[in-house]
Amino acid sequence: MSEKHPGPLVVEGKLSDAERMKLESNYLRGTIAEDLNDGLTGGFKGDNFLLIRFHGMYQQDDRDIRAERAEQKLEPRHAMLLRCRLPGGVITTTQWQAIDKFAADNTIYGSIRLTNRQTFQFHGILKKNVKPVHQMLHSVGLDALATANDMNRNVLCTSNPYESQLHAEAYEWAKKISEHLLPRTRAYAEIWLDQEKVATTDEEPILGQTYLPRKFKTTVVIPPQNDIDLHANDMNFVAIAENGKLVGFNLLVGGGLSIEHGNKKTYARTASEFGYLPLEHTLAVAEAVVTTQRDWGNRTDRKNAKTKYTLERVGLETFKAEVERRAGIKFEPIRPYEFTGRGDRIGWVKGIDNNWHLTLFIENGRILDYPGRPLKTGLLEIAKIHQGEFRITANQNLIIASVPESQKAKIETLARDHGLMNAVSAQRENSMACVSFPTCPLAMAEAERFLPSFTDKVEAILEKHGIPDEHIVMRVTGCPNGCGRAMLAEIGLVGKAPGRYNLHLGGNRIGTRIPLMYQENITEPDILASLDELIGRWAKEREAGEGFGDFTVRAGIIRPVLDPARDFWE
């Protein structure tokens, strides 16, 4: 597929301004420390506005009141989003209690947002609280380093509670990969943790002085679950086990979902299989993929800079051979693996270690005390008594992990009393949205605030057609950057303008096919009318066990995307 249009290894031309910024930043320091003391604005100025992203933060404002503040001649209400580095989504109950307190005491919204990258975010951190949040995280063994911008982001790992030993091994590799690919600059420690400046020169042996051309995402996957949506990621290690023990990984490279509306040089792409590698080569291969993308990725056009575009430009075999050369290995043929699903199994599951795991459905990952459903308080009370850990899933849910039989009833009572185990439909469990309005500066349409009521309407359609217990993997993302992973859904809505979305159909339940645009720039009533007709047909005409996405392809309703670089827009 990728050998059709091999191009230059390096794209020549004028570098993007982001490259200048990184080069001049003194290894990500900029003037952030000085800017922190500027009380005349609630935001960060100049390059610092972008540099703080390398430190795990985005500058945002409340878009619900932006126009009102402008009328009053006030600057936007600037506040930061902070995203924690949490490989595999594992967090101790001590850490949870600390983040709960910070959210309550020091953020505008008072909530904790679980993300589909297995971590948590704080929204609404005022500038005066930015340094304290980093220091709070450090005090409990956490940080926000490299969770945004042109680095290897938070490393995902399947939250599989059944295969306890395999999960433990895979999780250790997720942590090792995360640590190995971290930036070496001391900027984070100097600015946020008040560590002394050292006379030595900074070096970045893996990432380089200008870091990566674009964001880079990595996963460790344990089949048959594809809960982490490997095809949304640049580099994926698929666990291969023998007799229940991890022996190596299949490597898949070049997935990614972000596009730009109308820009046919951009496309969503599934990851390509490179081959199998024994465990001992994991870090060398991870480094080789990252450094190849570092050196060959497009630094002249950020919209064409991700690994998926590099792979298409130079050709899969060329990229693979370079990874082999740098890692000093030859990939073995891909070992057999298959995926059967990617949803979370809500409720109690017993692990092979005889401990119990309770997966709680958290709609859109937003942890807050709602009227009659004090979710945030409930999780805090569980954290106070639970001796195990919490695991954040890539479906924005939360697992109370490793609960001994003796504690099970007590934890279930707390969960039920706080509305954490309320019954929800299969459709709601399989629906997801990004944050979007009011805090995301890129949002074009509502997502998190739109999805709950939209799901109600889709549930009504399923009931109308006699299949109330069925589900369709449904995702809403507020803009084409695609944080809601709509480009791997059976029904994907991509925000185009307030109240308007592009409707994508034809993905599948296991997340291995990109959905094609079916209708463009349509309103909610139009979307529901289309879904009513198509779900009605699915209910009547489907084959045994056939998911909605597979049905739309088989019935000729939508053409499957087979070669995204060439047929995503056709």
From Swiss-Prot:
Listed InterPro entries: CysI, NiRdtase/SiRdtase_haem-b_fer, Nit/Sulf_reduc_fer-like_dom_sf, NO2/SO3_Rdtase_4Fe4S_dom, NO2/SO3_Rdtase_4Fe4S_prot, NO2/SO3_Rdtase_4Fe4S_sf, NO2/SO3_Rdtase_FeS/sirohaem_BS
Cellular component terms (Gene Ontology): sulfite reductase complex (NADPH)
Cofactor field: siroheme; [4Fe-4S] cluster
Principal EC category: oxidoreductase
Pfam family, one: NIR_SIR
GO molecular function (one): sulfite reductase (ferredoxin) activity
GO BP field: cysteine biosynthetic process; hydrogen sulfide biosynthetic process; sulfate assimilation
The protein's name in its UniProt record: Sulfite reductase [NADPH] hemoprotein beta-component
Organism name: Salmonella gallinarum (strain 287/91 / NCTC 13346)
